[in-house]
Design a protein with these regions (language model features):
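Transmembrane beta-barrel wall of Gram-negative outer-membrane proteins
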Residues: 160-190, 199-235, 244-267, 306, ...
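Outer-membrane beta-barrel signature, preferentially recognizing the C-terminal barrel domain
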Residues: 242-263, 295-301, 349-355, 409-426, ...
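Surface-exposed extracellular loop regions of Gram-negative outer-membrane beta-barrel proteins
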Residues: 233, 277-279, 328-330, 335, ...
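Acidic, small-polar-rich N-terminal luminal/periplasmic segments of exported/outer-membrane proteins
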Residues: 25-147
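Gram-negative outer-membrane beta-barrel transporters
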Residues: 367-374, 382-383, 505-526, 530-627, ...
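C-terminal beta-signal and adjacent terminal beta-strands/loops
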Residues: 445-446, 527, 624-627, 649-707
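Outer-membrane beta-barrel translocator/receptor signature
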Residues: 94, 109-113, 118, 123-198, ...
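Transmembrane beta-strands of outer-membrane beta-barrel pores
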Residues: 158-164, 177-179, 188-192, 220-222, ...
Length: 707
């Protein structure tokens, strides 16, 4: 089959990260070598939130949000400090609370492969970020294996959790010839508010999410073109650690990728677009009020990348490319009839916000000999941002702080331009089949996002509407912010078996890895105290008003992961001890702890595989968190241990049933990255502000059928 010149011309205006080559990230190592597999990533979690699929990755955690919108945290870096790529797309949160976080746009039913790279990211896949890269990729398009044959397959899955009465369902179908493929995935998830370990309902944590995606692909003559289109509709999603809830999120996207093999190497191209309509307010009796807040966002971008073979058998590859990303944002709050504070005008928070990035990069990966592999790269990125003039709700005394702030903001020039340089240098040394040492340095840069630079309100209510940290504080932007520059050193020592499960490229049958890291961040965007208030008017629940500000900071820690076979027999099958452990510290150089640093934690499991059975007993321990951010009044959280059990059985290669118990002993605990329980205080209107409670005991069941 031939792809028409017209189709090639359209596709060449863009790039992809290579859907021709399926990538599995079962190994977490510095990315001098890309591990490939035709098997999708498996998870031990029952979840409707893709951010939780990566819970077993060393150094990875999540900051609590809505039921499908947790924010990823990697070695202490969170949210915009991480590069999130969805099938190569870069999507921006169009919300001052990041309720529509990038990973929430790709539900677990659409995820086929994942990759997590902490800290030292190759310049070809990471810009405008300082903490690492997370990639979620759909399963690669499937085709019939011979001419004249028609491939048709599909399946469905249903799962349920008792802790929040969650029911999730998904369907998928594929029809393909040798050179053409069409696939559809649809999913829906709905849940009530969850119950904590003490039996109390965690108010305003209910949600519903609906997602649809259609993928069309064609291949032939060493090339492949893939078009993926889809929609998301979330009618409501509660956020118990924020002042507002999501009352609607609609998005539509299109993602076109093209790959072609030449004698000199590979050409990758991608063109993408996404539009988002987002609304905040209140939707249930669990938290009442009237305050509509609307945002409209649009992402558009492309990437062109050439992988040029400089040696035989991929021993030396030069990657050169160019990227462009454009983000448009309008954030406005309609007036509330009869309100003296929220009327008579529309509050304009971000007026025609623009953030455009243009990047060039070059990267050389070279295998020196059988033991040494190196990768070096440089990236130059121009970031331009701007916004229009703004206005407060009104001109009366209640609106005077915001009125004066709007006048001051409008009197200043808003346009900003940053020229950011990234550098990466990695080396991998494998003295034999059982040992690998990897180490590297990276300079990574991130420019402030639109909310960090351009939110302007000085009234307490307006400031509290900008907050993606779940800490109950209020925030205002800063036109004088500088880009963050992170200088990171990291290394990994990896002892492992010479053979792997699933053959070459699979997971070693046993391994032990240690990864220390250190980052010095110039102009880290933290926050300074500019005022205070009582949360919901409760004297025992004080909060701070903060302004984004640059401060130098240090982040450091160590991660460990392992897999160790304990027993293998005909009667018991294979039993292995697996897990991860880690600790992160973060401090400003002028004093004070950074927010949301994960204390010492261990996730350890005994896993048995016997025939069609997979059984897993898991222990999740988190130490007491005492090193907290005083400016944000971050709560101290107690240590806790949670036990989870899960089993699955596969019938005749097409039906899999699973059952498990999460938090077996119904432990009442607070996640150290959960933030504060605002919806609880909003209902009680008394007492102090508490840490957000974690999930109580849950019976989880599911079935997956393929045909």
């Amino acid at each position: 089959m031939k792809i028409t010149p017209c189709a090639c011309a359209v596709a060449l205006a863009c790039t992809t990260a290579g859907p021709v080559l399926a990538q599995s990230q079962e190994e977490e190592r510095l990315p001098t070598i890309t591990v490939r597999s035709d098997k999708p990533r498996q998870t031990t979690r029952s979840t409707s939130d893709s951010a939780l699929l990566l819970a077993d990755q060393p150094g990875y955690a999540t900051a609590a949000g809505g039921g499908v919108s947790a924010l990823p945290v990697l070695n202490g870096f969170a949210a915009d400090r991480l590069k999130i790529r969805l099938d190569g797309m870069e999507v921006t949160a169009a919300c001052g609370n990041q309720m529509n976080a990038p990973m929430s746009y790709m539900p677990p039913a659409q995820v086929g492969y994942t990759r997590v790279i902490a800290g030292i990211t190759p310049v070809s896949i990471g810009g405008d970020s300082i903490g690492g890269t997370i990639e979620l990729s759909s399963p690669v398009p499937q085709f019939a294996d011979e001419p004249g044959k028609l491939l048709s397959k599909g399946g469905f899955s249903v799962s349920a959790r008792s802790v929040n009465s969650e029911v999730s369902a998904s369907v998928n179908a594929t029809v393909a010839s040798e050179n053409l493929s069409v696939a559809y995935v649809g999913s829906r998830s709905r849940a009530e508010s969850y119950t904590a370990g003490n039996g109390d309902k965690v108010l305003s944590s209910l949600y519903e999410s609906n997602n649809h995606a259609l993928t069309m692909a064609a291949r032939g003559d060493g090339q492949q073109i893939v078009l993926k289109v889809g929609q998301q509709y979330i009618p409501y999603q509660g956020f118990p650690n924020e002042y507002m809830d999501m009352t609607g999120n609609r998005s539509t996207f299109a993602n076109l990728g093209y790959d072609r093999r030449y004698d000199w190497g590979m050409l990758h191209a991608k063109l993408y677009w996404q539009r988002t309509e987002h609304e905040m307010g209140f939707f249930s009796g669990e938290r009442t009020g009237v305050m509509p807040m609307d945002t409209r966002g649009r992402d558009m971008g492309y990437t062109l990348r050439a992988d040029i073979d400089l040696g035989q058998d991929g021993a030396s590859v030069l990657r050169v490319g160019q990227e462009y990303h454009s983000f448009r944002l309008n954030d406005y709050w309609p007036p509330v009839s009869g309100s003296m504070m929220m009327s008579p005008r529309t509050y304009v928070n971000i007026n025609g916000g623009t953030r455009d990035r243009m990047a060039l990069f070059a990267e050389w990966e070279h295998k020196l000999d059988a033991r040494w592999t190196t990768l070096v790269g440089v990236r130059d990125e121009l970031v331009k941002s701007d916004t229009g003039n703004v206005q407060s709700y009104g001109t009366n005394m209640m609106n005077l702080p915001d009125l004066n702030a709007a006048n001051a903001f409008n009197a200043r020039e808003h346009a900003r331009t940053d020229n950011n340089i990234d550098l990466t240098a990695l080396a991998r040394f494998a003295p034999d089949d059982g040992r690998t040492v990897e180490f590297g340095y990276a300079r990574k840069t991130r420019s402030p996002n639109l909310y960090e630079r351009y939110t302007w309100g000085r009234g307490g209510m307006a400031m509290r509407m900008t907050n993606w940290f779940g800490d109950g504080s209020g925030y205002v932007g800063n036109l004088d912010l500088k880009p963050e520059i992170a200088n990171t050193l990291s290394g990994t020592v990896d002892w492992h078996s010479a053979d792997s499960e699933g053959g070459e490229g699979g997971v070693p049958r046993w391994f032990v890895k240690l990864t220390p890291y250190f980052s010095y961040v110039q102009n880290y965007i933290d926050a300074d105290v500019v005022g205070s208030f009582n949360t919901y008017g409760v004297a025992a629940a004080p909060g701070n008003l903060l302004q984004f500000a640059n401060h130098d900071a240090r982040l450091y820690g160590i991660n460990a992961s392992w897999k160790w076979p304990l027993l293998q027999s005909d009667g018991m099958g294979e039993i292995a001890f697996t897990g991860k452990a880690g600790i992160t510290r973060g401090k400003r150089t002028d004093g004070g702890n950074l927010y949301h640093m994960m204390p010492f934690n261990v996730l350890a499991a005994l896993e048995q595989k016997r025939g069609a059975w997979i059984n897993r007993a898991e222990l999740d321990y988190v130490a007491r968190k005492t090193l907290v951010d005083a400016n944000r009044r971050e709560p101290v959280t107690a240590s806790y241990t949670v036990v989870n059990l899960k089993s699955s059985y596969r019938f005749n290669q097409s039906i899999t049933v699973s059952a498990g118990v999460s938090n077996l002993f119904n432990r009442n605990y607070a996640d150290p990255l959960g933030g504060v329980y605002l919806s609880g205080l909003a209902r009680a209107r008394s007492g102090s502000l508490q840490a957000l409670p974690g999930y109580g005991r849950s019976l989880d069941v599911g079935v997956n059928v393929s045909f």
